[in-house]
A protein has these predicted regions:
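Hydrophobic, helix-prone linear segments
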Residues: 1-60, 202-207, 211-225, 230, ...
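C-terminal transmembrane module of polytopic alpha-helical membrane proteins
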Residues: 1-48, 58-59, 69, 77, ...
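Conserved beta-strand termini and adjacent loop/short-helix elements that scaffold enzyme active sites
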Residues: 27, 120-125
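Intrinsically disordered, low-complexity Ser/Thr/Pro/Gly-rich regulatory segments
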Residues: 88, 112-121
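Short beta-alpha junction loops
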Residues: 89-95, 123-127
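A detector for small-residue-rich transmembrane helices and their helix-helix packing motifs
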Residues: 99-104, 109-112, 145-408, 413-418, ...
């Protein structure tokens, strides 16, 4: 036979789940204990309701301590700043001994009392007062017509049935959020990445700066020259097998998750814009030659963060803390390793969040907010495009490295054009002029080569290769005396160089034979 307290127990649960939209966290096998979570994180109070006929207050005290330990452990695992629990006991009678002092103040845990457990006992003699006491913490006043329900037993069964029906429907609705689409574009992007990697390898190597530039890596001078497609192409190129492997695995898992949540069309927009915004920030803030899908993959993180903004409880209950930790580790790693293009990662993260906020989640429409985010995105792109084009970042070392690769492959004209279009930097000016002079020698422009080599020596008097090449030019022109002097200078700087010794010996022998 059902008691008034059973009716009260299920009546309160029904109101919380059906009317107040609370979610069932856990329920005991006998349905006598239930934990409920509020619909928003703004309401930090978790509710635990126990249907148990109390006898002695020391049992009550022990149970309250167990609840406190569980809740504090949960708070620390989820890294919450604070967590409160309304711990409600539904009992036919109060404890037989003195008990009110045990529930008068909340139990607390944590250095700054971050965890609080407010305990209440509602028994047959204080139902209305007990409901009134918990109403200010629950932010609503539970109303249960126990007498009516007791006279109609089916009403109690309907209360129970409605609780679990609504709870199951909420679970089903949440599951549908993660199963909206299928990962079609994810697999297409993976295939493109793999195809481009093999193309790079067969074209000279994916770690070759020249090959990367040829196939569309982010290279600031080329973007400034009008090659706008370099804002998109880098996301499909990878530098070495390990780079490809890490990004492909990340795309497989993250991309699949995001595409299932947002659907294929939205995912395509998010991924492409994140890749673009990652390249844009790298263009504006970094001078390095770069490639990789990392920016677009960070955009997937950004999209998941937006999902967390819309569904915070579900986000933190399923993947939230893991996502935040992975993002934090990756960003810290990027700041500590100079070779990582962290600007691209941050740009992708921001771009993914903004793109997700514009297209929004399926079956979610907030036109005003979407318009605001669209305008924010326009401002974001405009600001960093202005910075990139108005205050361009150059790295002459990249140009010199690529030019050297062209020279090694005897593509002298490509190397010459690249060096001539590279802004001179005092730190690399001597190297740049030396490479230009080398190409000019190969092309037979000895006068230009001579001028550049003399300038190199003025900049760096210890540049031994400049003395040597200049000596070769004078030898070619028949000015053996000047050539001998320059070869001697080169040998003074590097006495053990065989080429320098050989040229010096030849010139000395020629001088002696003439004399």
């Amino acid at each position: 036979m059902n008691s008034k307290q059973d009716v009260l127990y299920w009546g309160i649960i029904n109101q919380l789940v059906v009317q107040e939209n609370y979610r069932i966290l856990t329920v005991s096998n006998d349905h006598q204990e239930i934990w409920l979570e509020p619909p928003t994180r703004k309401k930090k109070r978790v509710i635990r309701i126990l249907r148990h006929d109390l006898d002695w207050s020391n049992w009550l005290e022990r149970d309250m301590q167990v609840v406190l330990q569980k809740v504090d452990s949960l708070r620390r695992k989820t890294i919450r700043r604070g967590l409160e629990v309304v711990n409600l006991y539904i009992s036919t009678f109060p404890p037989v001994d003195d008990w009110e002092f045990r529930t008068k103040e909340p139990l607390v845990a944590g250095k700054n009392s971050e965890t609080k457990v407010h305990s209440f006992v509602i028994h047959s003699e204080n139902i209305q007062q007990g409901l009134s006491d918990i109403s200010h913490l629950l932010q609503f006043h539970p109303r249960v017509d126990t007498d009516k329900i007791l006279t109609e037993p089916l009403l109690l069964e309907n209360l129970k049935k409605e609780v679990f029906t609504v709870a199951q429907q909420k679970v089903k609705t949440e599951q549908q959020l993660f199963q909206y689409g299928k990962p079609r574009w994810t697999y297409i992007f993976i295939m493109i990445q793999l195809g481009m990697f093999f193309l790079l390898e067969f074209s000279g190597g994916s770690q070759s700066s020249q090959v990367l530039m040829k196939f569309g890596a982010k290279y600031n001078p080329s973007i400034l020259a009008g090659e706008w497609w370099r804002f998109f192409t880098p996301m499909f190129l990878h530098i070495g097998f390990l780079h490809l492997l890490m990004n492909t695995v990340a795309l497989f898992y993250l991309g699949s998750a995001v595409e299932k949540i947002f659907g294929s069309t939205r995912f395509f927009i998010i991924y492409m814009f994140a890749g673009f915004s990652g390249t844009l920030l790298s263009f504006a803030l970094s001078s390095s030659l770069s490639a990789g899908a990392s920016g677009a993959i960070f955009g997937c993180f950004g999209a998941l963060l937006f999902f967390g903004v819309i569904h915070p409880n579900l986000f933190f209950r399923t993947m939230g803390m893991n996502i935040l930790i992975v993002i934090g580790i990756n960003l810290l790693f990027g700041f500590s390793v100079p070779s990582i293009d962290n600007a691209g990662h941050i740009g992708g993260l921001i771009g993914g969040f903004l793109a997700a906020s514009i297209v929004h989640l399926p079956k979610h429409k907030h036109l005003v907010k979407q318009t605001i985010f669209l305008l924010t995105t326009v401002i974001f792109v405009s600001v960093f495009a202005y910075l990139g084009f108005s205050y361009p970042k150059f790295d002459p070392a990249v140009s010199l490295s690529v030019a050297q690769e062209y020279i090694d492959k005897e593509d002298y004209q490509a190397a010459y054009d690249l060096l001539r279009n590279t802004s001179q930097d005092h730190q690399y000016e001597a190297d740049q002029l030396f490479l230009l002079s080398y190409i000019e020698i190969k092309q037979g422009n000895f006068d230009l080569a001579k001028q550049n080599l003399l300038t190199v020596i003025d900049i760096d008097p210890l540049y031994d290769e400049a003395y040597f090449n200049l000596a070769l030019i004078y030898t070619h022109e028949g000015n053996y005396e000047q050539a001998l002097e320059l070869s001697e200078d080169a040998l003074d700087i590097k006495p053990n160089n065989k080429d320098y010794k050989e040229l010096y010996t030849q010139l000395m022998n020629s001088k002696e034979s003439v004399e």
